[in-house]
């Protein structure tokens, strides 16, 4: 990290106080609890770690890295292509609605921040009918000149933290369990972030059938705390 200001900006982007409603989504974890796949700290850790390794780390994280490169280069065509690709990649209606809603909230935040360095990002995303959350998030990170590997690290941490918070509520688990899970997941993030920044697009993959099934079945789950 080049400056303390960039670090502060990165912490702001990774903060659970970011007003995008991430805490209302479990991304299928709630159904995994309902079905008995997740039942305790150990099984929650396996579920989240497997998803980070086989899904988020192999597709969404590389997508963020590629989007940052496109934003930094001012490559509008590539940004729009990656945005459309990410929207099309969502495995269920709830997941697609999630990223669109969070993207909309980030677009609104862009206006509210009144930061001149974000003007180009705001102008482009306003032209899109639907914008995915990673598209806007990576645009802000690039505009704030945050290094890609640091940005992807923070993105993965924010995702993992949200998953752990969902597990704490849904299983439920205690605060100490949550901290142990975060410590274990945190130890895996540097490798995942480094891999995401170098993974060629031909090797991107979000082939996670159990995750897709969990997200789809959550849509008809009788009793729910979360929106996905």
Swiss-Prot record:
Q: What's the encoding gene here?
A: ureF
Q: Where in the cell is it found?
A: Cytoplasm
List keywords of the entry alphabetically.
Chaperone, Cytoplasm, Nickel insertion
PANTHER family, sorted: UREASE ACCESSORY PROTEIN F
- Can you name one GO molecular function term for this protein? nickel cation binding
Q: Look up the record and report any one GO term of the cellular component aspect.
A: cytoplasm
Output this protein's name: Urease accessory protein UreF
Q: What does this protein do?
A: Required for maturation of urease via the functional incorporation of the urease nickel metallocenter.
Q: Which HAMAP family match?
A: UreF
Matching entries from Pfam families are given as: UreF
Fetch the InterPro entries from UniProt.
UreF, UreF_sf
């Amino acid at each position: 990290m080049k400056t303390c200001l960039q670090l502060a900006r990165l912490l702001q982007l990774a903060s659970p106080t970011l007003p995008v409603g991430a805490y209302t989504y479990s991304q299928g974890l709630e159904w995994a609890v309902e079905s008995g796949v997740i039942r305790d700290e150990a099984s929650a850790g396996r579920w989240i770690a497997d998803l980070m390794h086989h899904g988020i780390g192999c597709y969404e994280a590389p997508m963020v890295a590629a989007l940052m490169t496109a934003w930094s280069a001012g490559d509008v065509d590539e940004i729009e292509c990656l945005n459309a690709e990410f929207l099309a990649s969502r495995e269920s209606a709830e997941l697609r609605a999630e990223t669109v809603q969070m993207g909309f909230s980030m677009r609104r935040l862009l206006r509210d921040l009144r930061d001149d360095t974000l003007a180009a990002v705001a102008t482009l995303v306003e032209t899109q009918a639907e914008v995915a959350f990673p598209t806007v998030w990576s645009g802000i990170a690039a505009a704030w000149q945050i290094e890609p590997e640091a940005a992807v690290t923070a993105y993965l941490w924010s995702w993992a933290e949200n998953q752990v918070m969902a597990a704490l509520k849904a299983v439920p688990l205690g605060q100490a369990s949550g901290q142990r899970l975060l410590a274990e997941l945190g130890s895996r993030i540097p490798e995942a972030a480094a891999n995401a920044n170098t993974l060629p697009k031909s090797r991107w993959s979000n082939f996670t059938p159990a995750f897709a099934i969990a997200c789809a079945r959550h849509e008809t789950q009788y009793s729910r705390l979360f929106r996905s």
